[in-house]
Amino acid sequence: MKRKLFFFTALTLMLACSCTGGRYETFSGYAQGGTYRVKVNMQGVKCSPETIAAAIDSLLEGIDFSISGYNRNSLLSRRNVGEEIVPDRYFSDLLELSAKYKELSGGAFDVYSGPLFDLWGFGFTSDSLPSDEAIERALADCKAGKVLNFNAIAQGYSCDIVAEYLYSIGVKDMLVDIGEIFCDGRNPSGKGWSIGVDNPVDGNDSPGSDLRGIWRSNGGAQGVVTSGNYRKFYIKDGKKYAHTIDPRSGRPVEHGLLSATVVAPTAAEADALATACMVLGPQGARELVESLDGVEAYLISSDGVWTSGGFNLEQQ
């Protein structure tokens, strides 16, 4: 279950905002089944806020038309029903990135695992569990590449695309929140951007209400994504089934990793790796993170916590 990190807003930050002479602008709207929020330092930017707002909306609409599984007219949806398509830049980018992270994760990240999610159902609302035969058929469909599903990387990638545009018009300080987060530079108080990391316990259904800590950026370009199982699960005959499906086995994971917060140079990378970590479990996730340059993580398991050396967490 991919959960949205929230933009940590403290009274001191709001006061700092009021002292900047209006240099920071916030843009918000609806995209990809939720809301987005983009905060930028307008110093040195010649574009008007109205122009930036329109450009962000246009970019997100273009991404939706390309890779959304919920838009029946998107390139992705048309491809999944057998129609021949001409991939655009977004579609091609995600195919390339997805292949990269599938290989890096040993198959723990796989955008062709859509048949498995269809089989198990979002949130596991079915009264009966899939049979072994049904799982094998779904795995065969995954191997054949019948259905693509970019959900595990699309929001992170969207953050990167919006950030790319902001860089092009001279923005240096930004926070892009489209379900996942990309940030660079400083917040209005002159510090690194602060992102709350939720405590992964049953019953914590409101992001930001129960925090494990606050992650603070180092002032550079960083994507940050949390993936977790504690809000989405199904109990059948006394057994708890996690929302995360292992695309290699076709079944829900059974390890003790509750959440994985990953920081990477891009939000797309953080998005894909957070998903892979939740499939791999505590040890596999740690090994994956330690093998990659520029990647940090905060892993919370049922029996402990692991923090990579460069993960900047301020405990609550």
PLM features: what roles do these ranges have?
Residues 2-8, 17-316:
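Mature catalytic core of soluble alpha/beta enzymes
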